[in-house]
UniProtKB/Swiss-Prot annotation:
Family: Belongs to the copper type II ascorbate-dependent monooxygenase family.
InterPro entries reported for this sequence: Cu2_ascorb_mOase-like_C, Cu2_ascorb_mOase_CS-1, Cu2_ascorb_mOase_CS-2, Cu2_ascorb_mOase_N, Cu2_ascorb_mOase_N_sf, Cu2_monoox_C, DBH-like, DOH_DOMON
Annotated TM spans: 17-37
Species the sequence originates in: Homo sapiens
PTM text: N-glycosylated. Proteolytic cleavage after the membrane-anchor leads to the release of the soluble form.
Molecular function in Gene Ontology: catalytic activity; copper ion binding; dopamine beta-monooxygenase activity; L-ascorbic acid binding
Membrane topology per record: Single-pass type II membrane protein
Cofactor(s), by name: Cu(2+)
GO cellular component, one term: chromaffin granule membrane
Residues annotated as binding Cu(2+) A: 262-263, 333
PROSITE patterns: CU2_MONOOXYGENASE_1, CU2_MONOOXYGENASE_2, DOMON
Positions bearing the site annotation: Cleavage: 39-40
Protein name: Dopamine beta-hydroxylase
Length: 617
């Protein structure tokens, strides 16, 4: 427990003695921390993951994951402390119903406590203190708080830390408060940041001696003074660039812009694009050449908080050589909520590649739903589920006898997506989860390495389900490419590469017309969902009463599907793919039960008095 203290500092030892004592204490602390986290941290750092929380960079979070302890060690750096700071997690990044930890002062004494907020955002002391404060320290950079939190606490007021996206909330206290309950969240400088906290514990493979690097970077552009910008830049590979394997990539973020660069992707243009005009500018610019729309094959994707991405030692992603475009498109998403002006940037992605091709080519396969309006979400829904199938018939035909091995995944929906999950089904039984995000955000998409490689055999089924929220919409949301339309996709990265590039489904269009015919007969409203109209127009005409909603849900749960078992040429494998029955699932996976921490891992029931030294900030 930190020593009790007031704000004032006491006389100390000489500078040389203090420096020696400080360096010794830091060294001992790091040794203890590394030992406590052994097996969960790369050797070079006990806290390897870092993100800026606020746009100004005054709050920075570092962390590590201990799967043996089922806990996370957080270090929060407060560069300019005023009267305190608030940090925590909530379902979608709201201050309401949040799980919080708060450092505050009453003007005389500083306190640290586990807290929670109710539906109105009122903050309360949590009687079960699951954030364990380990150290408070002044450094040249500012004040650092080191604390520990279990993944799950079995406290109904707490957030369950799971695989996938976590919405972090933070707030800066500008003035003292007499008590925790007196803190008014509505008057705070608040913000949110999205991140994957539970990083996979995968050792970094050694790079081969012949590995080369290529930087795909923005050419010292000036970040536009607006909140959101997508910047596109075309890079051309050297003429005669032979076939290589990408084996690793990592972000290059211009120093000082860490809080502005939200995510980045590198795409390869379509093979038939033998020439693409050079371009550097906003992706929505009227000056953008149309040919850039054909640069959509993902080579690399990075999002805030992610570190380097490694391919398995036996596989690499092929690029260059015959049948491969020489043109790459970099897309950088700048998030500039403070509308900062005059900031130059050369961020991008560094590719590591080798001319010595590995045993297997890695491939990317699309799972989920076909981009079609026959799959729709009614308006004013809080959790409407759509499901796409990769059937046993397709995997039996398209996969090699030894199967494939999925090592990474990128989930994707548009604006109303809230959850995404892909489950592997074998012999009618849910076998394992490929990837799951219960707090998915369309504003935070990255290629994530899986904790465990998932092997898919011929005859297996892959089921991808997406949950949507359309509470703020008055009309049905149909499937399609538009940003106000919806998607449900899992781009899985696997090896060895096969001809199967797309394994997706949609409800049979004929059965959907039977739905429209049914509601025409059973609804008294003067509405015509007539077959001569487009499917989108038909959905627009539906009066969304409870009957029509329930019947649509039922239709999607039993009606036959149209399967798209497609090669990279967009041609389906030979076979009958229409009016296919839904795969049968006779048993499902049990929900994992969180481990409840012992009382030894908790702090005392009340606030902890802490020494933050150096005055009020």
């Amino acid at each position: 427990m930190p020593a009790l203290s007031r704000w004032a500092s006491l006389p100390g030892p000489s500078m040389r003695e203090a420096a020696f004592m400080y360096s010794t204490a830091v060294a001992i602390f790091l040794v203890i921390l590394v030992a406590a986290l052994q097996g969960s941290a790369p050797r070079e750092s006990p806290l390897p993951y870092h993100i800026p929380l606020d746009p100004e960079g005054s709050l920075e979070l570092s962390w590590n994951v201990s799967y043996t302890q089922e806990a996370i060690h957080f270090q929060l750096l407060v560069r300019r402390l005023k009267a305190g700071v608030l940090f925590g997690m909530s379902d979608r990044g709201e201050l309401e119903n949040a799980d919080l930890v708060v450092l505050w002062t009453d003007g005389d004494t500083a306190y640290f406590a586990d807290a929670w907020s109710d539906q109105k955002g009122q903050i309360h002391l949590d009687p079960q203190q699951d954030y364990q404060l380990l150290q408070v320290q002044r450094t040249p950079e500012g004040l650092t708080l080191l604390f520990k939190r279990p993944f799950g606490t079995c406290d109904p007021k707490d957030y369950l830390i799971e695989d996938g996206t976590v919405h972090l909330v933070y707030g800066i206290l500008e003035e003292p408060f007499r008590s925790l309950e007196a803190i008014n969240g509505s008057g705070l400088q608040m913000g949110l940041q999205r991140v994957q906290l539970l990083k996979p514990n995968i050792p970094e493979p050694e790079l081969p001696s012949d590995a080369c690097t290529m930087e795909v970077q923005a050419p010292n552009i000036q970040i536009p003074s607006q909140e959101t910008t997508y910047w596109c830049y075309i890079k051309e590979l050297p003429k005669g660039f032979s076939r290589h394997h990408i084996i690793k990539y990592e972000p290059i973020v211009t120093k000082g812009n860490e809080a502005l660069v939200h995510h980045m992707e590198v795409f390869q243009c379509a093979p038939e694009m033998d020439s693409v005009p050079h371009f550097s500018g906003p992706c929505d610019s009227k000056m953008k050449p149309d040919r850039l729309n054909y640069c959509r094959h993902v080579l690399a994707a990075w999002a805030l908080g992610a570190k380097a991405f490694y391919y398995p030692e036996e596989a690499g992603l092929a690029f260059g050589g015959p049948g491969s475009s020489r043109y790459l498109r970099l897309e950088v998403h700048y998030h500039n909520p403070l509308v900062i002006e005059g900031r130059n940037d050369s961020s991008g992605i560094r590719l590591y590649y080798t001319a010595k091709l590995r045993r297997f080519n890695a491939g990317i396969m699309e799972l989920g739903l076909v981009y079609t309006p026959v799959m729709a979400i009614p308006p004013r829904e809080t959790a409407f589920i759509l499901t796409g199938y990769c059937t046993d018939k397709c995997t039996q035909l398209a996969l090699p006898p030894s199967g494939i091995h999925i090592f990474a995944s990128q989930l994707h929906t548009h604006l109303t997506g809230r959850k995404v999950v892909t489950v592997l089904v074998r012999d009618g039984r849910e076998w394992e989860i490929v990837n799951q995000d219960n707090h998915y955000s369309p504003h935070f998409q990255e290629i994530r390495m899986l904790k465990k490689v998932v092997s898919v055999h011929p005859g297996d089924v892959l089921i991808t389900s997406c949950t949507y929220n359309t509470e703020d919409r008055e009309l049905a949301t149909v499937g399609g490419f538009g940003i106000l339309e919806e998607m449900c996709v899992n781009y899985v990265h696997y090896y060895p590469q096969t001809q199967l590039e797309l394994c997706k489904s949609a409800v049979d269009a004929g059965f959907l017309q039977k739905y429209f015919h049914l509601i025409n007969r059973f609804n008294n409203e003067d509405v015509c969902t007539c077959p001569q109209a487009s499917v989108s127009q038909q959905f627009t005409s539906v009066p969304w009463n409870s009957f029509n909603r329930d019947v649509l849900k039922a239709l999607y749960s039993f009606a036959p599907i149209s399967m798209h078992c497609n090669k990279s040429s967009a041609v389906r494998f030979q076979g009958e793919w229409n009016l296919q029955p839904l795969p049968k699932v006779i048993s499902t996976l049990e929900e994992p039960t969180p481990q409840c921490p012992t009382s030894q891992g908790r702090s005392p029931a009340g606030p902890t008095v802490v020494s933050i030294g150096g005055g009020k900030g």
